[in-house]
Structures are given as C-alpha cells and as structure tokens.
C-alpha cells in the first residue's frame, strides 16, 4: 500500500486559486455550452455562477409603495391552476386561526364588555384555484373591529371576506372568556366566574347558521358511590364518603329566531345541573356545596339528559349537542357522554381529541 503524504508546496495558495479561476472564467467566456457541459460537474458549477449584484444591507425606512410598484409584486396564491400542487380538489376550509384582538360585546342588560377574542376565519377554495390571500380575512374582519359585536356584525364581516376572496362557503368562529358575577351559596359573597364561549357563523350552500358553544364546569357526585357510602354507614357504622369530581360539559346550540343571550345559555346549564363549581367560598358555602351535591347526584348519562331537557324547552334553540366528561376521582379514566338533536351536529366519526378537549384550565 502506498501512502501519499501531502506536502506544503502541493497545496495551491489563495493567489494560485484566484489565478486559476480567472483563467477558467476567461476560457468560459469564449466556450460554448457544450464545451462547458463536457467539464467535470464540480468545475462546471464554478463557471456557471452568474455575477450577483451588490445589494444594500440597510433597511430602507424611507421607501414608499405606490400602485405601480404594488402591481409588480408577485401574487402566487392567485396564480393559474397549473401551479396547484397535489390533487386538484376542492378544499372545504382554508384560512387563519387564532388571530386575537379586543372586541366589544353587547350584554343582556344593555351594557357592553370588551374581551380578548381569538378569531378563526375560513373560506372554501374551489378545485381550480391555487390559494387565497389569507391576510384579506383579517383585513375584512378588522373593518368591523370597533363595532359592538353580535351576530349581525359577524354576518357583515362574513359578507366582506366572502366578497374579497370570491368564495362560496365561509365560517367565522370567535372564542372568548365571558365573565359573570356569581353569588356564593350562603355567605353573601360574590365573585367572577369565567365561561369559555365561542360564537360561530357558518355559511354553506347559501344557508347560514348561528351557533354558540359554552363550556360549563360543575361537580358530579356518583349516585352509586353515594349509596355505597350510606350502606357502609347504616350497616356497619363505617364512615365513608362518595366520590365526586370536577366535570365539564360543552353545550353547542344552533340559534333560532331571537336567539339566546350568553346569560340565558349559562342559566339553562345551571338549571339542568346546579352543582356549578364555586368562586368565593367560606365554610358555610363549602357545607352548602356538599349538601347541594348530595341532593343532585348524577351519572354522566344523567348530565347529558338534564342539559338537553333545558335546551329543548327554549324557543331560541334549534339543533343542539351536549358533550359531558366526568373526570373521575375513583377511576383512572373519564366517563363521557354525547347527545345530539338535529342534523347540524350529527356525525359518524368523532375527532380522537374531542373528549380530551373537555378539560377546565384555570
């Protein structure tokens, strides 16, 4: 085996490399494309490099854009169908999610409240369209950002971004945390309870639906555990306590007619299952809460039906869905239920993360 040791004078110097590159460039300026293609690919790359202009590295803060310049800007999303990647298929929803801004909402008593709101806006995209200019969704929504929001304003925003984007179907969803003053059970104290609420306006096939979602957090005492505890007390004089747990229901309603105020929907939930978790608590309130739970033990099946009983009795509610999750203190798993009324919320397949999303984050 021969070992070749590189010596210092075998390594070209920088000057020699520059000279060699100059010779190569001079040759390439006169050579044909076929001659350059015949070179070793590594060498050919050296002579194919086009001269790159010197560019400014400083941000041009004084540069202004006029219509003529704007017209020269590339717009890939509005390009021809030939630029589409993948299957040339219609997309039901494409847009932006979770852009946030403060929004004023009309309250049932005639006042207004400003709340941080997370907005999701999507439109349909036809098969022969490359894409959408997503910033138009936000710009269209911002035109109405100073209004006092109700579904009429959301509809106006939807009209605008459908027109701006030339889409057939569209959706706006607005998520917020709605505060309500809630009295304690016995002490006379009160505190702010926050309710996760989402407003959703959907247009599909020319038909619009107004939907409200509410997460309601309550305590559920297991009826079976309550009876077993009482059995231990009665038959053996053994102290025992039934298990109860924080539970979450997501109530979704399609609005009809005059619709439903946030406060009305919350009151319906509270009337169905009165064991709502408490805000301000003294000892007498804690005792009262224990009594309230003992008076209203429920399985997760009971919870779904109790909520449904309230919803189906309200004239402002059309289709609805009730999902409940009792996050068991006895078991390592949760107990869940889902009840729907009408076609709006009927579905064959469920999102694998649907029930795990029923969690209260303080």
Swiss-Prot record:
Record pathway: Cofactor biosynthesis; 7,8-dihydroneopterin triphosphate biosynthesis; 7,8-dihydroneopterin triphosphate from GTP: step 1/1
Keywords, in A-Z order: Hydrolase
Organism: Jannaschia sp. (strain CCS1)
Site entry (May be catalytically important), positions: 222
Name of one Pfam family that matches: GCHY-1
GO biological process, one term: tetrahydrofolate biosynthetic process
Presence of the UniProt keyword Chloroplast in the record: no
Record protein name field: GTP cyclohydrolase FolE2
Family, per entry: Belongs to the GTP cyclohydrolase IV family.
This enzyme's EC code(s): 3.5.4.16
